[in-house]
Amino acid sequence: MKTEVTENIFEQAWDGFKGTNWRDKASVTRFVQENYKPYDGDESFLAGPTERTLKVKKIIEDTKNHYEEVGFPFDTDRVTSIDKIPAGYIDANDKELELIYGMQNSELFRLNFMPRGGLRVAEKILTEHGLSVDPGLHDVLSQTMTSVNDGIFRAYTSAIRKARHAHTVTGLPDAYSRGRIIGVYARLALYGADYLMKEKAKEWDAITEINEENIRLKEEINMQYQALQEVVNFGALYGLDVSRPAMNVKEAIQWVNIAYMAVCRVINGAATSLGRVPIVLDIFAERDLARGTFTEQEIQEFVDDFVLKLRTMKFARAAAYDELYSGDPTFITTSMAGMGNDGRHRVTKMDYRFLNTLDTIGNAPEPNLTVLWDSKLPYSFKRYSMSMSHKHSSIQYEGVETMAKDGYGEMSCISCCVSPLDPENEEGRHNLQYFGARVNVLKAMLTGLNGGYDDVHKDYKVFDIEPVRDEILDYDTVMENFDKSLDWLTDTYVDAMNIIHYMTDKYNYEAVQMAFLPTKVRANMGFGICGFANTVDSLSAIKYAKVKTLRDENGYIYDYEVEGDFPRYGEDDDRADDIAKLVMKMYHEKLASHKLYKNAEATVSLLTITSNVAYSKQTGNSPVHKGVFLNEDGTVNKSKLEFFSPGANPSNKAKGGWLQNLRSLAKLEFKDANDGISLTTQVSPRALGKTRDEQVDNLVQILDGYFTPGALINGTEFAGQHVNLNVMDLKDVYDKIMRGEDVIVRISGYCVNTKYLTPEQKQELTERVFHEVLSNDDEEVMHTSNI
């Protein structure tokens, strides 16, 4: 039932909350600062699952398993909508079974039809699953709707098209929604939609100067206002009145779920992250515990129900998309812990409750649990986090001090994988990101050496550049050529990104996400790198060893021979690590020299997801690895292929132990890659100590060292930014992975159940370094080739 939103409603909802500076203008940030309670205790207060929770879990798992066998249901006769699709339930015959309502579609795991990103793509997804869109709907959409994909390809330059065809610039969000935007969904819980709509209306009225920028902003605010009304309508489908603020922690969780699921009904971005939700919910929970409104068991049950809902989220994806983002990730990144500007840590009981879901409802890839790590966090929480990583290998860690030095504040959160955002920041830091996937820097370098001819398809000219004709490669000559190749690559990449984000705002503006953000926002534009380690190692080989080019009769380089030893990135050798820093600096400075859409700031990520496998299959030989080559019939031969390492990881051929890897990564300048420097590591429990307690304590010390400036490398300010932590022995999981059993691991930037990986991706995963010692100063590191 709709409630009249009066001052009395706010007095009732906010009773017991401190402070006034968050009441007159929406600011979850200020609300949290005034009201959160740091928790210094341990996990002993946590409750286990209820029978009801386990019943809901079983229904979800059984339904998903069934559809994985027979095929998932798809909408084929209706376009997705926030409020026009009926309410959905876990069990339509027992609606009271649920505690937290709101689902992505009207039926569990029914996949929404989302054509606004690209009608052809949406229809191709159906075709790949043996289905087709309703002919009448196709006719209406094809005649009346311009999709983002349509707009992008109307504007793409010939240089972009060549780069896409060569797979040097590929995988961009030009055929799928961009993602990486995080609404402050707790705003709905704290204020209700009516308050937020009135605030948007005031901001619309305040814009009086009519120019191109303000015309667009007024239209966007209007769309946000309409989206908030649709969120109210969505809540009403379940009998919920989200126009008013939440009265207790159950409603706060419920309101957040309605806001988030409204987003997931209409936006299928490559990452749909949740943001900094636990700390806000904890404030409601602490008030309810003090009042005796709910027990700890009840609050954990609400959290479990919410997380189970998040795990039902699924988008219809094309096969080409799955090659880049395998395992069907949704990147429901949930950020917790961290430090406040006043020196207080931000660990709360709710952080424990979210991590506890790995035990109560079982290990799973989603939500993407992310701990913002600082050495000053309570030891009990750090130890609990490490204990859960030791048990589950499904938590990622981000270094607070590294990100804070670059201006990311106390309510920053992680988007997608490793990318910091500060959604409510009023001091000019990034509120959102214009996502740009990544490009193949190694391929661009190899193509440049061949005079702009593709490194696999030698007859295909990608860009104009003088080739390097030396038989023995000279470092300075190669760097001059590489510098010009990077000019072409970054120019082309920026042009593509500006077009993509202009067209996305024009044809598929994410109004419902933007409605939960400040009206005036500042964006970064995320540019990524793939093939980083092999690029660095190739340049190191050219500089410190002897690299001979192998050419065909036309002078085309098809392979390389290396004589002598050379340092590799990841071995804690400044000779290689300085090259890594130089490559990042060159790349970032070239990007930053461009004018970007809506005056965004260029940021760089060393992150690949599973695209390192896809890019490997599109790249020829380099001085340090075997790539693909063409058979006589023109098909690609992958028989000798060595996969790229993921993200910022060193090559599998690097001789460093885990500590050497950490030191090399800590040297990288975050200012040159402040979209994230992703390290995915696998370490054997045996490398950490003899007993489980010793292993957990050592993990705490290692992460403290990696994330604390100067702690890992004395006399420096170097510190790391991100770690995907897997604590496991390869021999314990190898057979399970290859047989397609459930094995949850962290890969580059997210968590995946390995049964959903392709055979090639499983192969690449099991070929990664699994550290059996912490440092190669003691013993050799075990590679999987030794198994």
Curated annotation (Swiss-Prot):
GO terms for biological process: glucose metabolic process. Gene3D superfamilies: 3.20.70.20. GO terms for molecular function: formate C-acetyltransferase activity. It is found in: Cytoplasm. Residues 645-774 form the Glycine radical domain. InterPro entries: Auton_GlycylRad_Cofactor, Form_AcTrfase, Form_AcTrfase_GR_CS, Gly_radical, PFL_dom. It catalyses: formate + acetyl-CoA = pyruvate + CoA. Belongs to the glycyl radical enzyme (GRE) family. PFL subfamily. Several mechanisms have been proposed based on complexes formed with substrate analogs. After activation by the glycine radical, the cysteine radical, Cys-417, can abstract hydrogen atoms from the other active site cysteine, Cys-416, and from coenzyme A, and it can also transfer hydrogen atoms to product radicals. The other active site cysteine can attack the central carbonyl of pyruvate and covalently bind the product acetyl group. Homodimer. This is Formate acetyltransferase. The lineage of its organism: Bacteria, Bacillati, Bacillota, Bacilli, Lactobacillales. The gene is pfl.
